[in-house]
From Swiss-Prot:
This is Pre-mRNA polyadenylation factor FIP1. Residues 32-46 have a biased composition (Basic and acidic residues). InterPro entries: Fip1_dom, Pre-mRNA_3'-end_processing_reg. PANTHER family: FIP1-LIKE 1 PROTEIN, PRE-MRNA 3'-END-PROCESSING FACTOR FIP1. Residues 48-60 have a biased composition (Polar residues). It is found in: Nucleus. It comes from the Eukaryota. Keywords: mRNA processing, Nucleus. It comes from Kluyveromyces lactis (strain ATCC 8585 / CBS 2359 / DSM 70799 / NBRC 1267 / NRRL Y-1140 / WM37).
Amino acid sequence: MSSEDEDDKFLYSDEEDSNVVAKQEGPALKRQKVEETPKILAHDVPEGNTNEVESEASNQDSSSDEDDSSDSDSDVEIIIGTGNDTSKIDSGKSQISAITDTTPLGTADHAIAAVAGISDVVPVQEGSIPPEQQQQQQQTIDLNPDAQFDGKPIVQIDPEILKEKPWRQPGANISDYFNYGFNEQTWMEYLHRQEHLTKEYNPQKILMNLLALQQQGKLNDPGSGQPVQNTIQPPPPPMGLPPMFGGFPGFPFPGMMNNMQNQNVSSMNNMNNMNNMNNMNNINNNNNNNLNDKK
């Protein structure tokens, strides 16, 4: 034998021999124990109970065999795959997808009811909106608002009322307080003029004055050399019609317009007839002159 074999035998021979001896002695010891028990029982038990002793011995043999088989079977593990493997990620995804794919009937009914309820909404009528809300909706944005000072527009504040006048301090730049070249004096004049104009401005009054001037024929400039046209007053309206049926003052009644047009047409026809007569006279004179020349 080589030195390596001797070393292996020296290292592992005792363990292998002990394992072999243990395997050989194990079943022999069990048989000896099983064989000794019925002998002991045979001496102590009377002859009439020998069947019971034998049955007990057979039960013990079967139990020992079952123990041996259970010990041998305990080392074997059998795994049967009956479901999804929870140790894998795909199984979790499949479970989640299976849960999300199914929709409960309650939610579907609720969604159908919500869609059906859309047609039941009644549109809001214009008259049902309160006037305050209508005013808020109609409000527009002022792009050029007046500046505010203490909650009042700056054009309504008199500079003389202010306690502090920083523009009067020495070294102050007046353009920081007055724009567009104003100073304190000119700003006061501007405010008084604006107040006077707002009081006198009345669009209805201005329109009535213009209509009166048009009716009197004073709208044309007398220095321009154009003659002032005398407006013809319209006749009174027929019975049962409002007084303004003919139009605004200074304009003729609708029936008079047709008469004026007819008069203009007839005058134009007369002018054409007169021109034709003159042409005929000229032709006759020319013919007479030609005859005299021949003679």
